[in-house]
Amino acid sequence: MLFRSKLEYVFINEDFEKKQDHKVLLEELENKNIKIYKTSNKIFSEMVDTENTQGILSVLRYKERDLVNNINQDNKFVLILDRIQDPGNMGTIIRTADSAGVDAIILLKGCVDIYNPKVIRSTMGSIFDMNIIQTTQDEAVDFLKANNFDIVSSYLHTESYYNETTYDGKIALVIGNEANGINDELISKSDKL
């Protein structure tokens, strides 16, 4: 699998190092010249924010992405997230988008930080594989419309349901805030509701 992030180094605790089935992973990391820092269980527990850890912590370099360089002519399905605030919801959306074959996720202002530990955990690794772009609403809408995407907003008050709509061509599906839905300006710029 090609990850969009570069693994810089890992920390492991004493318990992780002792387990025989972890030796293969540690050898692979060493073969790839990834630095491994060994810590006591006590120090490791102070580095993480969960009580029951697996004993390994990775540090990755994540490259910021822009629309122009990360959405291309081959992309057909993009997800736009408008002010998603719950970390668990964000992680689940990213994980689901990855498994559904979404080409990119666009995060608009007001979304929870995707580097929040709860977001990262709930993605179950998908965050490192997905093309995630943070940008403004105006920039996203202008770029997508210029590149022939239909902006389709999930909207409570509509005359057609998702299974009654055709999804030909390039689609940018908008999912709104848990409490307030999609903002009115984005609704007005949508091609379909």
Residue ranges with predicted function:
Residues E27-E30, Q54-I56, S122-S126, D168-A172:
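Short, hinge-like loop/turn segments at secondary-structure boundaries
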Residues T39, R61-R65, Q134-T135, S154-S160, ...:
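Short gly/ser/thr-rich secondary-structure transition/capping motifs
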Residues D21-L25, D113-V119, N180-K189:
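Short, glycine/polar-rich helix-capping loops at beta-to-alpha or helix-loop-helix junctions
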Residues S153-L193:
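Active-site/ligand-binding-proximal alpha/beta "capping" segment
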Residues I43-Q85:
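Hydrophobic alpha-helical segments and helix pairs
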Residues F3-Y9, N13-E17, E28, N70-T158:
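RNA substrate-binding interface of SAM-dependent RNA methyltransferases
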Residues M1-D49:
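N-terminal positively charged helical leader segments and presequences
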